[in-house]
């Protein structure tokens, strides 16, 4: 899972993501460093939390580098990035964008094995019964 939550990177606790932080949960900056500086792909199966421009650009970049980006999830009912990035980074690559959704659980002991995503209501609270699990290593 790659956390792309705005221009200032925040900790998992500050983002309200429950559970532990096993290996495989990266901020956008760390994921970019792996790819750009170390020429290392951080994962094969990816879930991205946050639809800002960096999140969408990372979705495209990871896809171009050979990863499978399952989806980009945004807690707000609208994308937080530019419309052109929704088109050029997600739609052009067949990457789904789920608005009003957020990660409600992180799975894995030593390494991330998946996340649970839930739809949220107008108060940004998870809606019971909407949970869906996604297998991912990042």
Can you describe what each PLM-predicted range is?
Residues 1-45, 121-137:
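FAD-binding core/adjacent interface of flavoenzyme oxidoreductases
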Residues 1-8, 47, 54-55, 105-112:
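Feature captures the FAD/FMN-dependent oxidoreductase FAD-binding
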Residues 4-6, 25-28, 49-51, 75-77, ...:
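A short linear-motif detector with a strong N-terminal bias
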Residues 12-14, 37, 57-59, 108-109:
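Short glycine-/acidic-enriched loop or helix-start segments at secondary-structure transitions
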Residues 16-17, 22-25, 41, 46-47, ...:
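Alpha-helix boundary/interfacial micro-motifs
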Residues 30-78:
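Rossmann-like NAD(P)H-binding beta-loop-alpha module
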Residues 63-138:
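A Rossmann-like FAD-binding core segment of flavoenzymes
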